[in-house]
């Protein structure tokens, strides 16, 4: 039976440590980390994510604000809002909730955020720093996965890691973080031929393809470590990941559950990066 990698418990532990660090920062430097979340439109899934981020920020002791903007806002108006918070010393982290409406150029908006306040790690300057081995702000899901692997003492050096999914949010930055740990990395996607055969060679398999229960036991080798990034609904409407958990858990050594695996760590890393941005602000 596989060890269940409990991301929720790890997140709670890290959040408690963060509360202590924030309290010390307030006492010593009179600084409260500040996070502003900018939400355009009324996407129901985005609203849930934003509420979760708000709760986590308040729990950590941050100064937190959500800016709700009309879906009809122009690109220029949105950039003006971002620029306002770029200049506001009360806020150390700026998060623009994605996706944005179709009439807004996402890359232009990501470029508008001050890289020092880009706690999502999506600004090209931060992605460039990651690729050059000098990461500061890293996309939160891959950062959270690395914390889970560290917590469970998963050896990466010399190991074969396979990632299903090539997004800028998970797949690509995940590959770079694993390379930094001297893993041999294969980045795959839905059009990779003989995908199950490729995945079956992995010591560490990270799945972020967005298809419910896509990965079955034929994809995994005996004793592998499996990280499931997906969050979907199965035919019965129950939350599930991209991995068929019940099938795969009998074959692997460790696996993250859905829910309670990667998800809680994503928000925790967002809070941690906001705290780190506040620390860096002391240096100017």
Swiss-Prot record:
Question: Which InterPro entries does its entry note?
Answer: Aminoacid_DH-like_N_sf (IPR046346), NAD(P)-bd_dom_sf (IPR036291), THF_DH/CycHdrlase (IPR000672), THF_DH/CycHdrlase_cat_dom (IPR020630), THF_DH/CycHdrlase_CS (IPR020867), THF_DH/CycHdrlase_NAD-bd_dom (IPR020631)
For molecular function, the Gene Ontology terms on record are: methenyltetrahydrofolate cyclohydrolase activity; methylenetetrahydrofolate dehydrogenase (NADP+) activity
Its domain of life reads: Bacteria
Keywords of the record, alphabetical order, are:
Amino-acid biosynthesis, Histidine biosynthesis, Hydrolase, Methionine biosynthesis, Multifunctional enzyme, NADP, One-carbon metabolism, Oxidoreductase, Purine biosynthesis
Alphabetized NCBIfam families for the sequence: PRK10792.1 (NF008058), PRK14179.1 (NF010776), PRK14186.1 (NF010783)
Q: What does this protein do?
A: Catalyzes the oxidation of 5,10-methylenetetrahydrofolate to 5,10-methenyltetrahydrofolate and then the hydrolysis of 5,10-methenyltetrahydrofolate to 10-formyltetrahydrofolate.
The record's note on quaternary structure and interaction partners says:
Homodimer.
Q: What is this protein called?
A: Bifunctional protein FolD
Q: Coding gene?
A: folD
């Amino acid at each position: 039976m596989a060890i269940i990698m409990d991301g929720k418990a790890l997140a709670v532990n890290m959040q408690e440590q963060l509360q202590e660090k924030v309290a010390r920062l307030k006492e010593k430097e009179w600084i409260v980390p500040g996070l502003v979340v900018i939400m355009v439109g009324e996407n129901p899934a985005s609203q849930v994510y934003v509420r979760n981020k708000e709760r986590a920020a308040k729990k950590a002791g941050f100064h937190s604000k959500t800016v709700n903007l009309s879906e009809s806002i122009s690109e220029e108006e949105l950039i003006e809002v971002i620029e306002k918070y770029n200049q506001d010393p009360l806020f150390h982290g700026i998060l623009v909730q994605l996706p944005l409406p179709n009439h807004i150029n996402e890359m232009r908006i990501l470029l508008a955020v001050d890289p020092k306040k880009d706690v999502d790690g999506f600004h090209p300057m931060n992605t460039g720093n990651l690729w050059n081995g000098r990461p500061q702000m890293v996309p939160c899901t891959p950062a959270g996965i690395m914390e889970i692997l560290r917590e469970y003492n998963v050896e990466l050096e010399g190991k074969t890691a396979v990632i299903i999914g090539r997004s800028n949010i998970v797949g690509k930055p995940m590959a770079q973080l694993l390379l930094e740990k001297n893993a041999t990395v294969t980045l795959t996607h839905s059009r990779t031929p003989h995908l199950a055969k490729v995945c079956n060679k992995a010591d560490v398999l990270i799945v972020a393809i967005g298809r419910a229960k896509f990965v079955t036991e034929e994809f995994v080798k005996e004793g592998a470590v499996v990280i499931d990034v997906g969050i979907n609904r199965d035919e019965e409407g129950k939350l599930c990941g991209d991995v068929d958990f019940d099938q795969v858990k009998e074959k692997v050594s460790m696996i993250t559950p859905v829910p309670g695996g990667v998800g809680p760590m994503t928000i925790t890393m967002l809070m941690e990066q906001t705290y780190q941005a506040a620390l860096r602000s002391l240096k100017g």
